[in-house]
């Protein structure tokens, strides 16, 4: 199957990678320097259908923290912010996915989906150190 490319005339308007390049949901962590801690946000949904609704909002350009406030069942008031987390302090599957993400902003998030015993997570990273 050919890769998705929904670009409209190749207009990038000075932005980095966008959803039309198929990168937004993948994180693209290749070449990242090792980090001992990350500043992470997530949207936690118990139900698959609710997670899909949240993803659709993100794909349509909504800010990550706004979607977290509306859909997340954890840390919703903080826009999904978990703060700075060191290696070993998070669920193993969640942590593996989060540490592979490139940092991004809530206005133009790079995110990844993970299912854990807690439910469905949509994760983004704001910083690494």
Swiss-Prot record:
InterPro entries: PIN4, PPIase_dom_sf, PPIase_PpiC. One of its GO terms (cellular component) is nucleus. Residues 9-26 have a biased composition (Basic and acidic residues). Pfam families: Rotamase_3. This is Peptidyl-prolyl cis-trans isomerase pin4. Residues 1-34 are annotated as: Disordered. It comes from the Eukaryota. One of its GO terms (molecular function) is peptidyl-prolyl cis-trans isomerase activity. PANTHER family: PTHR45995. It comes from Aspergillus fumigatus (strain ATCC MYA-4609 / CBS 101355 / FGSC A1100 / Af293) (Neosartorya fumigata). PPIases accelerate the folding of proteins. It catalyzes the cis-trans isomerization of proline imidic peptide bonds in oligopeptides. Keywords: Isomerase, Rotamase.
């Amino acid at each position: 199957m050919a890769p998705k490319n929904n670009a409209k005339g190749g207009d990038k308007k000075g932005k980095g990678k966008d959803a039309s390049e198929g990168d937004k949901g993948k994180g693209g962590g290749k070449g990242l320097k090792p980090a001992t801690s990350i500043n992470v946000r997530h949207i936690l949904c118990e139900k698959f259908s609710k997670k899909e609704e949240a993803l659709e909002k993100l794909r349509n350009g909504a800010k990550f923290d706004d979607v977290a406030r509306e859909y997340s069942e954890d840390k919703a008031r903080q826009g999904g912010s978990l703060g700075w987390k060191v290696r070993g302090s998070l669920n193993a599957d969640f942590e593996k996915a989060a540490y592979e993400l490139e940092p991004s902003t809530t206005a133009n998030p790079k995110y990844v989906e993970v299912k854990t015993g807690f439910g469905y997570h949509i994760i983004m990273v704001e910083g690494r150190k």
